[in-house]
A protein has these predicted regions:
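Short, low-complexity disordered leader/linker segments with a strong preference
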Residues: 1-33, 100, 420-427
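Extracytoplasmic "Venus flytrap"
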Residues: 32-58, 83-89, 112-113, 180-188, ...
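Extracellular/periplasmic periplasmic-binding protein-like sensory domains
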Residues: 249-336, 398-406, 414-426
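Segments of small-molecule ligand-sensing domains
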Residues: 317-333, 341-400, 405, 426
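Extracytoplasmic ligand/sensor domains, especially the bilobed periplasmic-binding protein
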Residues: 53, 105-208, 257-292
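Beta-alpha junction/loop-to-helix N-cap segments that form part of ligand/metal-binding clefts
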Residues: 33, 46-53, 65-143, 152, ...
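Immediate post-signal peptide segment of exported/extracytoplasmic ligand-binding proteins
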Residues: 25-36, 69-77, 168-175
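Hydrophobic alpha-helical
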Residues: 114-125, 230-252, 338-341
Length: 427
């Protein structure tokens, strides 16, 4: 008569064990795996090193500070699976296939650069895999009809929009702009956006000309530009031609109120090479250490904040790369912010289903240490704002937008004669 009671008693420990195991499983879902064909060697190795450091920094923040990704009633940790694509297109395609079919990752982060990102997109699309772009700025990536490609870095056409907005606000009498840039797809895309925005704002484009890659003498172009007497110049393409552009402007004594050069002017090596000639020169950047995006700024703007503060990110980055002297640049910041965007999207979707997460990304609006996030229907980033930096007394100062600036712009910039005499570009 008492055997059933005894049997129940004997079964009780097993039942308790089952419940505990089930609860533990519910509280700790399987890791969410980010796959990445990273540029660890080859021509994009420096940018790739920064990107990996940014990703690992924000993964650590998610796992250790945020507690993981809310999913299935628990908190799922993030895991990171990367391979070296050697900055080669053929490696990108094969590695994306491997990450999806062999490693069974939940999302693929694109490699650095527009070319590599575009090469990998059809592979991810063919597998129905979410493909997040942190380093491909070319707008053409988002004109191919890809459903699963989503951008974190701002598009090339947005590079000089802030520069033009700034000049219109601080110098409403400035009307004449000259465009002189490298004949490359990237620079042409940047200037296409600049030209359209300049016309929208009512500026007169008094000069527009390109120069070939690898140019060694810009004297004929700059002489023709000088004759149009522009108020300001938007130019450049990459580091070497940007440096040449500035140096030969000084040689020809071409003075303008503002000179903004893409790619070159934001690099420390630019000032190191040119010294006082670089004073007052500006350039657009996706992110700079010193921006003022913060939890308080997000609250004031009525938007959600996620992630570490800027200083916390820098500390996490240094730990990730194992170098206490390395400062993260925008390659690290945009890659790290991409981790945060994915985490929020999974949290909002409540599932790892790719279509649900992609839909959540389309509805997402938030701020992080990198700035604002918002994408259009094609996946193109439209929320992030470029920052403009200016060399002032040998230091890079963020001068635009006002919400991120660490100092006021110096406008007009000193003349080359004044700079040769020791005058600094101070507001």
């Amino acid at each position: 008569m008492q055997r059933p009671a005894v049997q129940k008693l004997l079964l009780l420990p097993a039942l308790i064990f089952f419940v505990v195991v089930c609860n533990a499983h519910a509280e700790t879902p399987d890791p969410i795996v980010i796959g990445h064909p990273a540029c660890l060697s080859g021509k994009y190795a420096k940018a790739g090193e920064q990107a990996v450091g940014g990703i690992e920094a924000c993964i650590r923040w998610v796992n250790e500070v945020y507690g993981g990704v809310p999913l299935d009633g628990g908190k799922a940790p993030l895991s990171y699976k990367k391979y070296d694509c050697e900055s080669k297109k053929e490696s990108v395609t094969s590695l994306i296939g491997r990450l999806i079919t062999v490693d069974r990752v939940d999302v693929v982060f694109a490699p650095y650069s527009s070319g590599l990102t575009l090469r990998g997109a059809p592979v991810a699309e063919g597998h129905g895999m979410l493909y997040m772009d942190h380093g491909g700025a070319n707008n053409k990536i988002f004109e191919q009809g890809f459903r699963y490609t989503v951008q974190t870095i701002g598009p090339a056409t947005s590079y000089h929009m802030g520069t033009l907005d700034m000049i219109q606000k601080i110098a409403p009498d400035a009307k004449k702009v000259a465009l002189a840039y490298e004949d490359s797809e990237f620079a042409s895309m940047v200037m296409e956006g600049a030209k359209a925005h300049a016309q929208e704002l009512g500026f007169d484009i008094v000069f527009e000309r390109t120069y070939p890659k690898g140019v060694t003498d810009l004297t004929p172009l700059l002489s023709a530009l000088k004759a149009t007497r522009p108020d300001f110049i938007l130019g450049g393409g990459h580091f070497e031609d940007g440096q040449l552009f500035n140096r030969q402007m000084a040689d020809l004594n071409i003075d303008v109120n503002c000179l903004s050069l893409i790619a070159a002017a934001t690099l420390p090596a630019f000032y190191k090479a040119l010294g006082s000639m670089a004073e007052g020169v500006m350039g657009p950047s996706h992110w700079e250490y010193g921006v003022t995006y913060s939890r308080e700024a997000a609250k004031a703007a009525g938007t959600r904040w996620i992630g570490p503060s800027q200083d916390e990110f820098v500390s996490l980055f240094k730990d990730a790369v194992g170098d206490p002297d390395m400062i993260p640049d925008y390659h690290a910041a945009e890659a790290g912010a991409q981790v945060l965007a994915y985490v929020l999207a999974v949290e909002e979707a409540g599932t790892l289903d790719v279509d649900a997460v992609r839909e959540a990304l389309g509805e997402l609006r938030f701020m992080s240490f990198y700035g604002n996030w918002d994408i259009d229907d094609t996946g193109l980033q439209i929320g992030h704002t470029m920052v403009d930096v200016q060399w002032q007394d040998g230091k890079r100062v963020i001068v635009w937008p006002e919400s991120a600036q660490t100092g006021k712009p110096c406008y007009p910039m000193p003349t080359f004669e004044e700079k040769a005499g020791g005058k600094k570009a101070l507001p």
